[in-house]
């Protein structure tokens, strides 16, 4: 059986003032592509679920929600958050893991809401593990569920490493649009996300969904308008810049 979420304790007046554990609600599919994504996340026969699409399409919150349900239902030991190394990490104060908190804070906030527990407690007892890609090789995450965000920044070699760590299931999110292409990966021709989509697309144990419609963007008001209008323009600009 997996570990149960910890009981929340807080002075009542503080709880009423700001209950961060209720900041986000269960994600609800809003479009046909969302529905397909949720069905794949719920389908335990799909060991790897890949969502490729624009920002604002609820990729991350949906993956985290179903990962949390897997832990709460005793189907997984915990959640492993996999992230690419970012510039300047070594200059930040704190322990190795503390340096990574700002990079994954939004995902941890989702986890707090869906597991009703402070993320620091979950990190302490390894119900949640932050795994920098740099140190992934040689690890064994049998029994865990992995969540990989910003997969377009990962190399093909590291994507292979991720998929061979023995996790119960792996939820991989990313965006293969030119705007999100990594300059370093341009030298090898493709990202790990593109490599995985090309080599494993016909596998029956892998589910793939592409958020390729404007209606898939669920951000409110002007944010959606910015994504819809600016992303294509930025992609064109970036393509011209490379040529």
Describe each PLM feature range.
Residues 2-40, 46-243:
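Conserved helicase motor core of SF1/SF2 NTP-dependent helicases
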